[in-house]
Each structure stands twice: as C-alpha cells, then as structure tokens.
Amino acid sequence: AKAIRYRAPYTTNADFRKAVNNGEIAYNDIHLSQMAQEVRYGFMGKVNVAIIEACEVTPDGKIYLTAAGGIAPTVCRLADQIIVELNAAHSKSAMGLHDVYEPLDPPCRREIPIYKPSDRIGLPYIQVDPKKIVGVVETNWPDEARSFAAADPLTDKIGQNVADFLAADMKRGIIPPTFLPLQSGVGNIANAVLGALGRDKTIPPFEMYTEVIQNSVIGLIREGRVKFGSACSCLLYTSDAAD
C-alpha cells in the first residue's frame, strides 16, 4: 500500500524488510530499548497521534494495554491525540498485567527500584487526559504469533546440560538452596532449557526475567515450577496459553 515512509526501531516482517532493502521505506535500526528515550529527546520529531491497542479504556482516561507495553506510555503522554484500538481478542483479564513506569532521562536518571522479578513500581494502566482520546475503534484481531521449531534431540540435550549445570552448582553451594532468578531468551533452545529446568525436581520453583513470555513459560507457571515471570511482552501461539 506504500503507506509507511519511515519506521523505527524493530521489525520481523519479510515484506517490510524487502521494502527497506529496496529503498522504498526509510528505516532506523536502533536498539528497541532506546526508542522511548529517543522519542522523549525529540529525535523522532513531534508525536501528533498515538494509536494504542487496549483491552479496556475507561471514561476517566485509563488505558489498559494488551500483549505488550513498549513505548506506549511515552507516546501517549507526548501525543496531541490518541486513538485507542479496543481489541476484543484480548481478554479483559489482562487488566493489571502491566507495570507502567517511565524512567527519568539522562543525565537525571535514577536507579530503577526493581530488585526481583515480582517487584512492581508503576501503574497497571496508562493514565491520559480523556480529552486527548479522539476515537475508539473496536476490533477482534488475534496477535500473529510465530511458532518455533519443535524440540529435537540436540535442543533437548542442550537444555538438559544447562539444567544439570545449575543443579550441580546448587549442590556445591554456589547457588543457594532457594535458587536464584533466571533470565531466559526466546526460541526453541530457550524453551528446551526451561523444559529441562521444569522437569528437574531438585531445582525449586523460581522467578524469571525474559524479553518475551512464550507458551513454555505459561506451562511452567501452571505446573508451579515458575513462580513469577517478568517480561516486555507476551507471544502466545495457542489459544489455551492465551487464556
């Protein structure tokens, strides 16, 4: 449709990537974590309209986000106008899932007071002036989630090696008997590691950080193996996990 002239900072869409490589779209491949700060500094220009997906919006201007937060708090605060996409594909049970917090920018930034994955320091919604909300568009459009390759003997072995290594360090006293928070990546190897940790009953239930909560994490939460997962977004490719 040639509707995009410029985009930052991240994409996984093959058609978009082709358009960028053909010079049809200007693209800034900055780190995802830097985008909100770049916007606040004004490097991306003025924010006229913010389009925000939500599972609920209230008359007093509370916007409850869906599967991700990202730069939504920043653009909502800076935008002249806000359009809310109220997506019925996301349950209202997602209300309370988010921890909305904007840090100060350098050189005035202070420490972010999070000391364990289950800490909360913000609000479960974005608070905006309701007068800025110029439209609410109702949709029912599930997320397009990419599934990962199924586990195979190689990934299973990698996962088991990591679990054995951590269990051995716990037995040696290097890791305390209560275990420690883990940070997991994304993909079939990360899923294999989490699966092996979940099966090893010598490792107690643990909290974890991850960039994206996937089906494997949801399964471990249901089994009582993961006590809490802290992430930037959810990428769930079955309706059972989403529920």
Where are these regions (language model features)?
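Conserved alpha/beta enzyme-core scaffold
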Residues: A1-D243
